[in-house]
C-alpha cells in the first residue's frame, strides 16, 4: 500500500534502496531513540535530499503525505539511481 505519513515514506524508500547506512544517524526529537530503523531511514532520506522539509531536529514522522508527494519522492530517488 501507499504510505500515508513521513515515517512510512522514509521507510519504504530506504528499504527499497537496500537499507543503506546513513553517514550520521540523527537523534530526532520526535522519533524514539529505540526506533533505530526509523532513525536510520529518516537520516538517510535527509542526507539524500529526499525529505527536504525536515526541520533541524524534528522529522515529523506522522505528518500526512499525499500520493503525489510519495510519487515525486519515488521518482527523485529513481532519477538519482538510489532505487531501481
Region annotations inferred by a language model:
Residues 1-10, 15-39, 52-64, 76-84:
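Feature responds to low-complexity, polar/acidic, surface-exposed segments characteristic
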